[in-house]
């Protein structure tokens, strides 16, 4: 839903890289090259960014007002 602030495995900060990563991948760049450019080297951090599914916009439509 929301990108984790830190990697679940190693605790490295990854949320600050999400906007740049998702923008560049949507523009058609290779995800591996983008992660290399963003200096994401650990496999656990790469996995967290590569496998994240951003569905928050879809879920917001189903929440009830308080």
From Swiss-Prot:
Cofactor(s) this protein cannot do without: Zn(2+)
Any single GO CC term annotated in Swiss-Prot or TrEMBL for this entry: DNA-directed RNA polymerase complex
GO molecular function: DNA binding; DNA-directed RNA polymerase activity; zinc ion binding
Residues annotated for Zn(2+) binding in this entry: 7, 10, 44-45
InterPro entries found in the cross-reference section: RNA_pol_su_RPB10, RNA_pol_suN_Zn-BS, RPABC5/Rpb10
EC number: 2.7.7.6
Gene3D superfamilies, A to Z: Homeodomain-like (1.10.10.60)
Cofactor binding, note field: Binds 1 zinc ion.
Keywords for the protein's UniProt record, in alphabetical order: Cytoplasm, DNA-directed RNA polymerase, Metal-binding, Nucleotidyltransferase, Transcription, Transferase, Zinc
Major localization class: cytoplasm
GO term, biological process aspect, one: DNA-templated transcription
Localization, UniProt: Cytoplasm
Key word Nucleotidyltransferase present: yes
Record note on quaternary structure: Part of the RNA polymerase complex.
Family: Belongs to the archaeal Rpo10/eukaryotic RPB10 RNA polymerase subunit family.
Role played: DNA-dependent RNA polymerase (RNAP) catalyzes the transcription of DNA into RNA using the four ribonucleoside triphosphates as substrates.
Name of this protein: DNA-directed RNA polymerase subunit Rpo10
Record organism: Metallosphaera sedula (strain ATCC 51363 / DSM 5348 / JCM 9185 / NBRC 15509 / TH2)
Gene from which this protein is expressed: rpo10
């Amino acid at each position: 839903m929301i990108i984790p602030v830190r990697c679940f495995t190693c605790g490295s900060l990854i949320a600050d890289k999400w906007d740049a990563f998702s923008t560049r991948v949507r523009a058609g760049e290779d995800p591996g090259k983008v992660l290399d450019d963003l200096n994401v080297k650990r496999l656990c951090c790469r996995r967290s960014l590569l496998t994240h599914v951003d569905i928050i916009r879809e879920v917001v439509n189903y929440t009830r007002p308080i």
